[in-house]
Amino acid sequence: MKNLSIFMFVFSLCMFGHVSRARIRIANELKFKKNLWMRCYSKDDVLGPHIIPIGGHFLDYFGTNFWGTTRFMCTLRQGPNYIHYQSFTAFKLFSMEDHGGLWDWRAREDGIYLKKEGNKFIKNPVNMHKVYDWIN
């Protein structure tokens, strides 16, 4: 019984050590005073919908799961009529060793850009680059 208690204690420390704080940031860098509509969801959570004013941003901190399968999908729409839109995977882990980091999305007139920041535990960090075009 004592060995089981020690095992459970060590196992729980490992589990708590792995659960990390990941972040999604969505910034409105559109021109012509356009607002940005956003809504994101995962298996367990729904973020939004929110209207992000020009120059503003939305930031959410969340824990990743132990199995390394945390995903967030987002839909962005350009104001004022919200005709131009894009739906995409805004966050995903690449393995159980990946801790997520900051996925920094920027909505611009010509598309949606991503910069992924992190430390040595972040898989595949990337500099700011265009990932998606707007759909009409």
Swiss-Prot record:
Disulfide bond entries: none
GO BP: regulation of translation; rejection of self pollen
Signal peptide: 1-22
Cell location: Secreted
Keyword Zinc annotated: no
Name used for this protein in its record: S-protein homolog 17
GO cellular component, one term: extracellular region
TM spans (from-to): none
Pfam families assigned: Self-incomp_S1
Source organism of this protein record: Arabidopsis thaliana (Mouse-ear cress)
UniProt entry tagged with the keyword ATP-binding: no
UniProt family annotation: Belongs to the plant self-incompatibility (S1) protein family.
InterPro entries documented for this protein: Self-incomp_S1 (IPR010264)
Alphabetical keyword list: Secreted, Self-incompatibility, Signal, Translation regulation
